[in-house]
Amino acid sequence: MPAKRLFGIISIIFLFVTCISCKSSTDLSEEKRILVIQSYEKHFPAYEKMKEIMSSDLRKKGIHASVYSFYLDCEQYSEKQQRQKLFKKLNELSTWTPDIILVNDDQALNALISSRHPLAKSIPVVFMGVSYPNIPIIRKYPNMMGFYDKPDYKRNIELIRRL
């Protein structure tokens, strides 16, 4: 995993942990419910490292958390199927309403937004690893924050020319 991407993941997890600790700084001993929406399948290589970093940061902050990870498996399902699958899962989680949603990669963010599920607008959402965000749409969600990996087109073109 490139150092820049790993630094970005660590930064967003720090932002995420800070958000969840600020959301309810009155009682950190209360268990927080965290929903993680991943774009790919469960065994995608980067996910294990991300879990380790998040668990470590939550422990350091003294935050007790119940983490539920949902995997869109975007390479197996169409965008419509991903959106429907996510909407159904969010409905199933209605008795376990998350305190915060962490979204990883473009497909997961797009599926959440396009699902139009009420939770997408009512709970804090932190996104990361997004390359092509739809900024005008994201601005309609005041509960969403995060970072995206802005493509360096000039550098990519130079690389293509060298190849």
Predicted feature locations:
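Short hydrophobic alpha-helices and adjacent helix-cap/hinge residues
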Residues: 2-10, 22-163
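Hydrophobic h-region of N-terminal signal peptides that target proteins for export
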Residues: 13-21
